[in-house]
Amino acid sequence: MLCSCRSKSKFLALTLLLLSAATWLYLSVGETEYGPSLGPVAPHFSATSLFQVELESRLREAEEENRRLRQQLGEIRNEEQSPGGGTEGDNSSHCEHRSLTEKCELIHVAIVCAGHNSSRDVVTLVKSILFHRRNPLHLHLITDDVALRVLRNLFNTWMVPSLTISFYNASELKPDVAWIPNKHYSGIFGLLKLTLTKALPSYLSKVIVLDTDITFATDIAELWAIFKKFTGEQVLGLVENQSDWYLGNLWKNHKPWPALGRGFNTGVILLLLDKLRLIGWEEMWRLTAERELMNMLSTSLADQDIFNAVIKSSPTLVYQLPCYWNVQLSDHTRSEQCYSELADLKVIHWNSPHKLRVKNKHVELFRTLYLTFLEYDGSLLRRELIGCPSEGEQQGGSQAALSQLDEEDPCYDFRRESLASHRVHLSFLPHLTPTPDPSDVTLVAQLSMDRLQMLELICRHWEGPMSLALYLSDAEAQQFLRYAQASEVLQSRTNIGYHVIYKEGQLYPVNLLRNVALKNSHTPYVFLSDIDFLPMYGLYENLRKSIAQQDPTGSPKALIVPAFETLRYRLSFPKSKADLLSMLDTGALYTFRYHVWEKGHAPTNYAKWRTATTPYRVEWAPDFEPYVVVRQDCPEYDQRFLGFGWNKVSHIMELDAQEYELLVLPNAFIIHMPHAPSFDISKFRSSEHYRRCVQVLKEEFHQDLSRRYGSAALKYLAAERNQ
């Protein structure tokens, strides 16, 4: 057998040498007859240039064939040097013919994912797979309600080519395993991999199953190709456990579940689903679990204990994968025996409860590899590089609209970025949905990394629910996560929804952010604020009372919260309206933007507010942009407005067009805190082109408003012309 393998290796090496020589000779002939042929192609093609194109194409084909043969040769050499799969303890070399995965063969991967934290972890896993892959992928995600909401929206907005996602309801599978006591930190979800023959479609014959704490360092197609090595009764592909857990010698009186030798780790599994169904897998694992639980009482390592008990009884079911397909970084691991250099690593498994803080002499190397994908820009993975035809690719309306844009349009950048598809990760951190209350109100705001310091301040002023949209890069999202987890103030709050919108383009998509925060509020009313404003103490309860006093059957209302500002970074915050009026009189506070944009808030009628004791009505006026409390189902913000200029004005205009009644609250206020000018406001002030494009967008908005609301909207156009 070994001689046969070496003969095949020599044959492939000879083929590779001859192919390389033929390619070199072919290229040399082309250069001799037609001159240098691989330079840029001229605009006007001659017979010579056509030949150059053909020659270049054939050269690429030859290089691809060369690469494929090199890979196949390398695999055969690896098989000569390393033990093949089989039962535990089999170190003989099996020179089996291993066909490479077909170029466009669809690879199926199943992952159990539940909760907010697991939804973040699975993104890093998927990034590592997508980065290395050369094949189409179909992800089968078994999720709870939280992960379903988060991941469905994330993948819909990510729009990765040649990637299909299917979701399966974990709640429907829980009854199958709920009877099993489990001490593992994964809880009931750690047992659901046992149910995959039932959960996944009957047409699916094989699948790779992964834990969420996995990082790939190679193409997953290499793992998929190992299915072809299964023989006889083998239906499970697993890596041996790399700790002494199942040997029972970790501590005194340690009694693990039964296992074959060291046992096997289930962080990476190859499942032959069709064969498992034929042998009655569901009954097999259930009977085994019932038998062992009579003595063990509960599982310690969730599904892994039951898989190992089954394998102990039926060892012919398992194909042992090489250990580099699951390098385990558990607390008692011996995984360093699996690799001698970085090139040996294929899959890293962070299977310690301590995750990145696990003690391991090579942990810095592994952590660096993990952080590479954690902070990698996921938008780069949208690029189609594998060249496989795709069925049912996501081709949103925005893509069609983008293709219709005129690149000669002076405002092309504004139009293109308003149509950009941003990845959206809802509920980036765990939070609770508020208890239903007809008068409850959520503070809605958006921010970027440079405003992060405002979060703790706002939390001290507003005890109610918040929905915050954060515009971050992948790396900044991790900085925010560390900041939030280290903050006692933020950690003490369970009623704040943080929704990450990943950066794309140069302009700040302010109204997209507002809409994401607005749509993901879970109370009947919302307070549409900005991150630079501190609410008065007690504003949350004040607004709830004001809402309760409104007639819910009348016309829709927008309750205006008067806005003020200070130029002082250190401010003794007013505790009441009387304190605020005193500070207003002494010059410690001002009405908001009175010195640069007075008409933005002048219709609030601050003179009347000073003495008002009941809400009073004001009329809409051009450029009015107050901060308001409205029902959560109010009109969304117009996303054509990016950066600075008219993003709030347009929204108030739409509220007025829908006949919202504007009421100023007499005992409520917010104060704007000073900060350095944003990039967008600096651009607006310095660039005439920027201001001209904002004006163009304003005019188009007026036209759209007239089409939607007819003659009632003509007053806005008239008011604009009279300014």
Curated annotation (Swiss-Prot):
EC number(s) stated in the UniProt entry for this protein: 2.4.-.-, 2.4.2.-, 2.4.1.-
Residues where Mn(2+) 1 binds: 211, 213
Annotated binding of Mn(2+) 2, by residue: 530, 532
KW Glycosyltransferase (keyword) present: yes
Entry GO terms, CC: Golgi apparatus; Golgi membrane
Region entry Disordered, spans: 73-94
Domain of life: Eukaryota
BP GO terms, sorted: protein O-linked mannosylation
Annotated cofactor note: Binds 2 Mn(2+) ions per subunit. The xylosyltransferase part binds one Mn(2+) and the beta-1,3-glucuronyltransferase part binds one Mn(2+).
Record function comment: Bifunctional glycosyltransferase with both alpha-1,3-xylosyltransferase and beta-1,3-glucuronyltransferase activities involved in the maturation of alpha-dystroglycan (DAG1) by glycosylation leading to DAG1 binding to laminin G-like domain-containing extracellular proteins with high affinity and in a phosphorylated-O-mannosyl trisaccharide dependent manner. Elongates the glucuronyl-beta-1,4-xylose-beta disaccharide primer structure by adding repeating units [-3-Xylose-alpha-1,3-GlcA-beta-1-] to produce a heteropolysaccharide. Supports the maturation of DAG1 more effectively than LARGE1.
Name of protein: Xylosyl- and glucuronyltransferase LARGE2s
Gene responsible for this protein: large2-b
